[in-house]
Curated annotation (Swiss-Prot):
This is 2,3,4,5-tetrahydropyridine-2,6-dicarboxylate N-succinyltransferase. GO terms for molecular function: 2,3,4,5-tetrahydropyridine-2,6-dicarboxylate N-succinyltransferase activity. Its main location: cytoplasm. The gene is dapD. One of its GO terms (biological process) is diaminopimelate biosynthetic process. It is found in: Cytoplasm. The keyword Calcium does not apply. It comes from Sulfurovum sp. (strain NBC37-1). The active site is at 265 (acyl-anhydride intermediate).
């Protein structure tokens, strides 16, 4: 059987209702069609998934059409697991085209992007084995490369919030590959063919060896976002409009990023988030959950300055400053003069701070308007009420 050409939008709604009413049907939380890159040695191994479009808690009518098109193409869709992945074929595309018939003419620009995907596939003579569709029915641990990539896309496209996507086990699913431009190569393939490739001049220029691709290999940033070195941002990072990532010591890991215009000249580790208007100075490090924070994810507030080569392993509020070269961790002993403590309390009326002069860093986490410094005579870390406004150059963001 096949889907008969749908004549109207009302008929389309009827089709969707029929599909979603079938026994056991589950509405996916996310889905998309990807072109996959397979291993040069092992063609069954998927190395990368390129999604021209992902759907995240949206476009459920298109999901129903894709499920029906799979079923009519003799593919049994399994709704029982947390995800379902299948290779699509020309029969699937023909069925989807028939279902989307009322929308084909108007599927241009920003309209009906899922229909545009199907229209593009329909123009290809033979889609072969390299196009896969994935449905996520719940945010469980990913089980496939396609599912990992769909979630990374959701983060980098700002469809999902940072720290709110389950990526447990992703490292074990992705292969460590040599990246040549946007093409992944199996390392074993390069080893086995090294002699021939080097002698005949076909050995590729390897840009990196990693399990994750670069952000710019998959995502087009906002017009006012600048990334001066592609290697500085990993796929799965999330960059708000107006973010500038300078060359040198900067780096943004997956599941980390910015919430507004931010100057990034330092390192934002996995799970770390930086608020709008903040400045991560040259070589400054914001620790991730695996690098010294005891599993406590670090959020940096708005209009906060992290000085060059500083290390921050403590959540900071708005309007804070960490001086260059110092380290602020949960266990760091911090001296606060009585008069400065009163000013900090005034800026943070909900904070419960004891009247003492020595605090552990964790007692100050998330507080606003604190300037962390080091006494150059004693070496003590001190804190005082910040009196300096942190403001980015609007022309640069």
């Amino acid at each position: 059987m096949a889907i008969e050409t749908v004549a109207s939008t009302d008929a389309f709604k009827v089709l969707v209702a029929e599909v979603t009413a079938q026994e056991g049907y589950r509405e996916p939380m996310a889905f998309g069609i990807a072109r996959v890159d397979r291993g040069q040695k092992n063609a069954e191994k998927v190395l990368q998934a390129n999604f021209p479009l992902i759907n995240w808690k949206e476009n459920f009518g298109s999901a129903a059409v894709f499920i029906k098109a799979l079923q009519e193409a003799k593919c049994d869709v399994d709704f029982s697991g947390s995800e379902f992945v299948a290779t699509i074929n020309d029969n699937f595309v023909a069925n989807a085209m028939a279902a989307f018939a009322p929308y084909l003419a108007e599927a241009t620009g920003d309209s009906h992007k899922n229909v545009q995907v199907i229209k593009t596939l329909a123009k290809m003579e033979d889609i072969g084995k390299n196009f896969r569709i994935v449905f996520l029915f719940e945010d469980a641990n990913p089980e496939s490369v396609e599912a990992v990539y769909l979630k990374l896309y959701a983060l980098s496209l700002r469809k999902a919030e940072l720290r709110k996507v389950n990526l447990n086990g992703a490292f074990g699913i992705l292969s460590n590959v040599a990246w040549v431009g946007n093409t992944p190569y199996e390392l074993d393939y390069l080893r086995e063919n090294e002699i021939e490739m080097k002698l005949n001049g076909t050995y590729p220029t390897v840009d990196s060896v990693d399990k994750f691709p670069r952000f710019l290999q998959h995502v087009i940033p906002d017009d006012n976002t600048r990334i001066l070195e592609a290697s500085k941002v990993r796929m799965g990072a999330q960059l708000a409009a107006g973010t500038t990532v300078m060359p040198g010591a900067s780096y943004i890991n997956f599941n980390a990023g910015t919430l507004g215009p931010v100057m990034v000249e330092g390192r934002i580790s996995s799970s770390a988030i930086v608020g709008a208007g903040s400045d991560v100075g040259g070589g400054a490090s914001i620790l991730g959950v695996l690098s010294g924070t005891d599993g406590n994810p670090i959020s940096i507030g708005e209009n906060t300055l992290l000085g060059a080569n500083s290390v921050t392993g403590l959540p900071l509020g708005d309007g804070c400053i960490v001086d260059a070269g110092i380290t602020i961790l949960a266990g760091t002993k911090i001296k606060i003069a009585p008069e400065e403590l009163e000013k900090i309390k005034a800026a943070n009326p909900d904070a419960k701070l004891d009247n003492k002069t020595t605090f552990k860093g964790e007692e100050l986490q998330g507080l606003n308007g604190i300037h962390y410094r080091q006494n150059s005579l004693t070496g003590e870390i001190i804190a005082r009420r910040s009196t300096r406004e942190v403001k980015l150059n609007e022309d640069l963001h």
